[in-house]
């Protein structure tokens, strides 16, 4: 049985979701998700994309970020996207379904990118949220660790990693560790994130 507290929380989220200006705008523009606008904001502030870039999108479904990236890099660019969930085809994006934290899927990623000069790895992925920080924080940090580990193998010199995390216990320590591994790293908090959201994005340059 679903608790009344959880039911009320879900109903409140649904109400906020459908009233959200970015959800409405995404529907109007036929954009796959409101996260498109987060990436647009981060890109405008940091100039992430250039025509002809090669991009890896981890945790890509439903495809908002891949959709935005494909528009920015043009026909000469390349995007490889991966998610455990299915994703409808996007022109200019190669997609395969699988868990990138799984060794078999990771090997497929590495094989597909073996001859690619990869400029950007991006991940808007989050674990299934429990609402319990002591569970959610280790899970999101583990995802971040995997993304950064993948970057060690495939990211070109001066390449960039953009990955979602949460503010909470353990993040500051993890961020300090990453400072030692990249020439530049900073935290981005898009205005397009929901006001109550703890999500932040790490932007790191090799």
Curated annotation (Swiss-Prot):
Q: Name one Pfam family in it.
A: FtsJ
Record Gene3D superfamilies: Vaccinia Virus protein VP39 (3.40.50.150)
Tell me the compartments it is located in. Cytoplasm
Query: What CDD domains has UniProt attached to this entry?
Result: AdoMet_MTases
Q: Which cellular components does GO assign to this protein?
A: cytoplasm
Q: Which SUPFAM superfamilies match?
A: S-adenosyl-L-methionine-dependent methyltransferases (SSF53335)
Keyword annotations for this protein, in alphabetical order, are: Cytoplasm, Methyltransferase, rRNA processing, S-adenosyl-L-methionine, Transferase
**Any idea which positions bind S-adenosyl-L-methionine?**
63, 65, 83, 99, 124
Catalysed reaction(s) here are: uridine(2552) in 23S rRNA + S-adenosyl-L-methionine = 2'-O-methyluridine(2552) in 23S rRNA + S-adenosyl-L-homocysteine + H(+)
Q: What is its EC number?
A: 2.1.1.166
| EC supergroup of this enzyme | transferase
Where do transmembrane segments lie in this chain? none
Q: Which InterPro entries match?
A: RNA_methyltr_RlmE, RNA_MeTrfase_FtsJ_dom, rRNA-MeTfrase_E, SAM-dependent_MTases_sf
The domain of life is Bacteria
Q: Which residues form the active site?
A: 164
What GO MF annotations does this protein's record show?
A: rRNA (uridine-2'-O-)-methyltransferase activity
> What NCBIfam families does this protein map onto?
PRK11188.1
**Family the UniProt entry places it in:** Belongs to the class I-like SAM-binding methyltransferase superfamily. RNA methyltransferase RlmE family.
Q: What does this protein do?
A: Specifically methylates the uridine in position 2552 of 23S rRNA at the 2'-O position of the ribose in the fully assembled 50S ribosomal subunit.
Record protein name field: Ribosomal RNA large subunit methyltransferase E
Q: Which organism is it from?
A: Buchnera aphidicola subsp. Schizaphis graminum (strain Sg)
The coding gene here is: rlmE
């Amino acid at each position: 049985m679903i608790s009344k507290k959880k039911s009320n929380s879900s109903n409140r989220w649904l109400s906020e979701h459908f009233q959200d200006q970015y959800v409405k705008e995404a529907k109007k523009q036929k954009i796959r998700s409101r996260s498109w606008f987060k990436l647009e904001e981060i890109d405008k502030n940091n100039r992430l994309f250039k025509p002809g870039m090669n991009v890896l999108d981890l945790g890509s479904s439903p495809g908002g970020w891949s959709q935005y990236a494909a528009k920015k890099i043009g026909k000469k660019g390349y995007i490889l996207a991966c998610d455990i969930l299915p994703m409808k085809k996007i022109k200019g994006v190669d997609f395969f379904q699988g868990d990138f934290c799984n060794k078999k899927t990771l090997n497929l990623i590495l094989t597909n990118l073996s001859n690619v000069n990869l400029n950007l790895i991006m991940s808007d992925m989050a674990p299934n949220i429990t609402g319990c920080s002591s569970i959610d924080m280790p899970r999101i940090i583990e995802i971040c660790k995997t993304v950064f580990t993948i970057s060690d193998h495939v990211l070109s010199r001066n390449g960039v990693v953009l990955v979602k995390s949460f503010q909470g216990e353990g993040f500051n320590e993890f961020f300090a560790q990453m400072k030692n591994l990249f020439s530049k790293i900073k935290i981005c908090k898009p205005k397009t994130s929901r006001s109550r959201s703890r999500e932040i994005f790490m932007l790191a340059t090799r």
